[in-house]
């Protein structure tokens, strides 16, 4: 899965999303920042919402509070994403169930950067 929309990715290098997105990009994935200010990050144009992204998205990676992630998951379903990835400490069992019912691959409370490091 090559195209990752990273929800919560802005230009703050102190935030986990910034480093994880860079690692994904370095591993050959296309990253798409999704952030209220729609910033360009790591050379990629940002969008305010998932619905604004032109073209298909494989994975929606969620760097948002658990109380907000249900809406993001519903947007991921609506745009036809193949998977949703809820980062460490982002927990919403109901949202994951909705995603699974819609046929999406789901990951919750894990970090792709950590998973990459485990493989290598």
Task: Annotate the PLM regions.
Residues 28-29, 81, 104:
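Short phosphate-binding/catalytic loops that engage adenosine nucleotides
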Residues 14-15, 22-42:
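NAD(P)-binding Rossmann-fold cofactor-contacting core
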Residues 88-116:
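Rossmann-fold NAD(P)-binding glycine/threonine-rich loop
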Residues 5-7:
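Conserved beta-strand elements of the Class I
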Residues 50, 54-93:
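Mid-chain, well-packed structural core segment of small domains
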Residues 41-44, 58, 94-97, 115-120:
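Short, charged, surface-exposed secondary-structure boundary motifs
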Residues 1-3:
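Extreme N-terminal starter segment of soluble prokaryotic enzymes
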